[in-house]
Amino acid sequence: MHTIEEKAAAFVRLLQIMDELREKCPWDKKQTFESLRPNTIEETFELADALLKGNKKEISKELGDVLLHVIFYAKIGS
């Protein structure tokens, strides 16, 4: 198990990567709340399917995808 410090450092690194992508990646730069919405809906349905199946590995993966979208929306809004 990773320490809280390691988990915090990993989360900070994720935020840094998202900052860099938003600044430098052409696709990321042009995304809006509206353009990202269909992808978010798809990820949410994938999470729902994993939950219904009780597949912990898939649930974890899909939660990561949804979290990434939450962070992306926060970056768009900032």
Mark where each language-model region is.
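Extended low-complexity intrinsically disordered regions
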Residues: 1-59
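Hydrophobic/aromatic-rich structural module bridging two neighboring secondary-structure elements via a short loop
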Residues: 60-63, 67-78
